[in-house]
Amino acid sequence: MQEEKQIDFDFNEILNQFRSGKRLTGKDGLLAPLIKQLTEAALEAEVESHIANDALNGRANRRNGFNSKTIKGTSDGSFELETPRNRNGTFEPQIVKKHQNTISDEIEEKILSMYGLGMNYVDISTHIEEIYQVSISTATISAITDKIIDKVKSWQSRPLDTIYPFVWLDAIHYKIKDGGKYVSKAVYTVLGVNMEGRKEILGLYLSESEGANFWLSVLTDLNNRGLQDILIASVDGLKGFPEAIKTIFPKTEVQLCIIHQIRNSLRYVASKDQKEFMKDLRLVYEASTKDLAEDELLKLEEKWGKKYPIVLQSWNNKWENLSVYFKYPKEIRKVIYTTNIIESVHRQFRKLTKTKGAFPNENSLLKLLFMGIKNAEKKWTMPVWNWSLTLSQLAIFFEGRLDSELKI
């Protein structure tokens, strides 16, 4: 058995050098040699234990020199690490694994933190060198952020609650390289409010197009992960969604977003008419009851129908799903009649991605959005406003469907 390495650390000498102004940490810091020796001593113990275990099991084995690699420390600087080998090539070090080039998670955590704030690889590399006096290539940073992909896959397939009282669906578009060219793809975000009143992203789904078949696959995925019931789903007029949701969740009420409908309507109204048109339209969607709203919609059609038939036709065709919120009290109305709650998530996504332009593949986008979700979740610690009253009202309107979840 090879003689165990001794730790050679002269405390008094280190103290004198520190007093003379030499740094303890960072590049060429005084502590780097100690970290190197401690790490190599631990590796020596590992390989000796491995060889001894082979001997106990009747396998001939012995040491076979060292491999050398540069270890990038955190505040303790960088150093050359000698990792022992064995003749059979079966030794797998655990203290510092074969392809590991840091001895702490601190750098990786800092890199992921900066990446989650939307910083690009070059800026991250610069900041890491400023903080730790360690040079990290953009390729290494990319490899570190790629570790998020496994977390994304696990998150995408995680079990869901059996019921979410409210669910919103909305899309945000990005340029992604596909087949050698950049194409526009939509990222559909599914946001729910659980029985505790807390927001939760249920899933992210990428697609070049929407439609009943696409939404059927999304809803089937949610169902397969444990979601059995949604009371009210709010969407922005996504094509084919109301039909698809009735297939998987036939009892769910579908509310089309009023704000999206207004925006789409104004695209077809002349600028000079928009102020007056909006004054009349507001009487429709701000009415206290559905009957009053329908009276105002008739007046709107009488006044503007000939000039803007496509706009009034859209309101009439979608009225069944646009008017769902009228049956509920104001506490529930405020929650469901727009998709503002999910648009705020997309605003956070845009902050992260605004400097990116386009993405080389889907994973590069998903891992960044996933970090954005993790950052948002840190703030989602409290229930949505007035949740206790809202939940009580839901229990009345959806009699029996919340009984299994209500602890009363």
Identify the residue ranges that each predicted region occupies.
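Subset of Sec-pathway N-terminal targeting signals
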Residues: M1-F18, R23, L30-F66, T70-G73
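Conserved beta-strand -> loop -> alpha-helix junction used to position metal-binding or nucleic-acid-contacting
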Residues: I232-K239, A244-D280
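Metal-dependent DNA phosphodiester-chemistry modules and their immediately adjacent helices/loops
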Residues: E92, S265-L292, K299
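Basic, short loop/linker segments at the boundary and entry of helix-turn-helix/winged-helix-like folds
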Residues: N61-L117, Q133-D146, A212
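RNase H-like nuclease fold core
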Residues: P84-R87, I95-H99, K147-V235, K239, ...
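Electropositive nucleic-acid engagement tracts
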Residues: N57-R63, N67, M119-F166
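Acidic/histidine-rich catalytic cores and adjacent linkers
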Residues: Q2, L283-I408
